Amino acid sequence: MSTAAVLVYPDFFKVAVSSAGNHDNAIYNRWWSEKHSGVKEIISEKGDTSFLYNIDKNPDLVKNLKGKLLLFHGEIDNNVHPANTMRVANALIKANKRFDMKILPTQRHGFGDMAEYVFWGMSDYFAKYLIGDNTERPVDLEEMNKEIEQSGNKKKQ
């Protein structure tokens, strides 16, 4: 949704970070699209029923990008296929649009033990492009994972 927002309303949204984004409903679960984006039932004069999905695809909207965009995706995402992000990246490149992208090796949809890395990556990106803070904050994933284990919270893998 963040990518769609920066592409549909480019004069309002200046920065977006997409985390395992569903950029093209044609290659995602139809039930999700129907539930969250709506579907229009059309009954012909003969009584035949068809359904209209009028959901814009982010790759078709990339020409509108004016702001900054960071795309994250897990290499083995088992919910939203990485092809969703690859399609929007391909369209952005063909439209000669600048963007940032990070593919997280061995990670699924929730980013597993790299979730903190993604969180701080998003934080740094927003700080840099919204308030001009270019301070890089190193993320010690091993230390963060130790702290999580010591606190008794279990991480999803």
For each of these PLM feature ranges, what is it?
Residues 1-157:
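Active-site-proximal cap/loop segments of hydrolase catalytic domains
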